[in-house]
Amino acid sequence: MNNKTNVLLQAEEMIKPLALEHVPQDSDVEAVIDQWLHAIATDSQFYCNPEISKPEQLKERVISLLQQNGLYTTRNAFFNEVFSALKLKPDFDAKFRFIDLFAGIGGIRLGAQANGGVCVFSSEFDSFAQNTYSFNHGEHPFGDITKVQEKNIPDHDVLLAGFPCQPFSYSGRCEGFEDKTRGTLFFDVLRILEQKKPKFALLENVKGFKSHNKGETMFIALKALEEAGYEPHWTILNSYDYGVPQYRERWYCVAIRKDLGITDFSFPDFKDRKTKLKDIINLSEDDQSLSITDFEKNRIKYHFDNYEKQERVQHDNSMYEPHTKKGRHGVFSFLKPDGSLRFHVGDVAKTQIQEAFYACLETYAPTIIANRVPKLWDIQRKLSVTESLRLQGFPDEFNFRVSKAQAYKQLGNSVTVNVVQAIIENIIKIKD
């Protein structure tokens, strides 16, 4: 992060020797220092090896060092130093503490912060995503979670993880469901849950997770959560039902620690909060880099004109649903690796279908995925980065210090903030 105050930069240099002394040798020192400074500001626990030093004693030692050098007076003043340069800051008095695993650019984090939560530990492997995360949230996330010892992670109330979908072991030689997850990143979620025992976990994955390997992958994951002492509740939610004009279905699971005695959990239902693309589009946008080619314009016009003659196009320029979903007959576009588009008109085999690439202002956008940006038929251009942020529920204040291509990719890999925020609202209700 390059927008820290002078006090913060001095504090980093001051505590670096202690960080090198009290954390494992393979730790990301930059991430450790940021975590310590945030822990002081938010009154949270330090990341450290508890076998070397007690977290609270180490925290007091660091605060004392900062006080001696005039870098710390009160927590309120230090909180302002840590977060003053950030537009997306947590509350001073946190309602709960969470960790952010496979954090990406922090979409899940924003949903938790909107409910009064404060992040006490974050982890993200991709260096480009780390850059974006650091600039917006003020902390450099830890890297490879497989190298982080669970005992070093600060105490927390909620574990958040948008973990990758990976196949589990089906050899039958394993004694328990947790053993079947070894070698996958879901195993790292489990080992942290078992060591730290947070009250809740919110997990996110692609919709296909429920049917991966004929449902066996999800079955093993849920059983492993039960073995770890948690009661899992899962569902499929669509971002379109939560106030953003994007059709994006994802698998969500809320795992509740069994000893809390909470046997039921209800996912929020906001099906009356639908918006259209026109609600988030800047019609005066004149960025020429968003333009589509004349070839694309002519091809789209040709296909829409033909479909209009066949009465298959509505007046808002959107295709009738039965022709693009049930009948799988319509205009489909496929994005090639070089960024160009290939069109297909007519019947398409189910296995060949990708979601419609073009959207209209009166409808919703297709799912944003990495390396694919929805394009608007009505005004014939690509969505801007800001408009793509809005499709995922991110605030306009969110900033990227990476290329535009990376920004689109990161948003495509992110979660929809609105959905996470709504789920955590319900978690807070049963927590309190």
Where does each model-flagged region fall?
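Core alpha/beta nucleotide-donor-binding catalytic domains of modification enzymes
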Residues: 64-65, 69-200, 207-219, 226
